[in-house]
Amino acid sequence: MADSDTSAPAKAKPAALRKGALVKVNRKAYSASIEAAASDPTPPDYIFDGPGELLVVKGDYGQVRWNRPVPDVWLRMDQLEVYS
């Protein structure tokens, strides 16, 4: 018998988010973050429902503008996901 490779297939990397992308916040990633600990204990639902527009990407952070009369926010890029 031939040896078979039983290792799991490599996960595909998600597409990199770029300026202008429509995004929403990943609830699980945000809830476990230091940003959530430093913010209101009940975050607004619109950040998880989306869409928000990614305005600027600097290093590990992105500035998001929501389609509401609220200030833009900076969040870690690993807390953001593509809005679909």
UniProtKB/Swiss-Prot annotation:
Which reaction(s) does the protein catalyse, per the Swiss-Prot or TrEMBL entry?
Answer: a plastoquinone + NADH + (n+1) H(+)(in) = a plastoquinol + NAD(+) + n H(+)(out); a plastoquinone + NADPH + (n+1) H(+)(in) = a plastoquinol + NADP(+) + n H(+)(out)
GO cellular component: a single term: plasma membrane-derived thylakoid membrane
Q: Which gene encodes it?
A: ndhO
Q: What is its EC number?
A: 7.1.1.-
Q: What is this protein called?
A: NAD(P)H-quinone oxidoreductase subunit O
* Organism domain of life: Bacteria
Mention one GO molecular function.
Answer: oxidoreductase activity, acting on NAD(P)H, quinone or similar compound as acceptor
Chief place of localization: membrane
Signal peptide range equals: none
Top-level EC class: translocase
Q: Which HAMAP family match?
A: NDH1_NDH1O
Q: What does this protein do?
A: NDH-1 shuttles electrons from an unknown electron donor, via FMN and iron-sulfur (Fe-S) centers, to quinones in the respiratory and/or the photosynthetic chain. The immediate electron acceptor for the enzyme in this species is believed to be plastoquinone. Couples the redox reaction to proton translocation, and thus conserves the redox energy in a proton gradient. Cyanobacterial NDH-1 also plays a role in inorganic carbon-concentration.
Localization recorded for this chain is: Cellular thylakoid membrane
The UniProt subunit note reads as follows:
NDH-1 can be composed of about 15 different subunits; different subcomplexes with different compositions have been identified which probably have different functions.
Q: Which family does it belong to?
A: Belongs to the complex I NdhO subunit family.
Keywords of the record, alphabetical order, are: Membrane, NAD, NADP, Plastoquinone, Quinone, Thylakoid, Translocase, Transport
Annotated membrane topology = Peripheral membrane protein
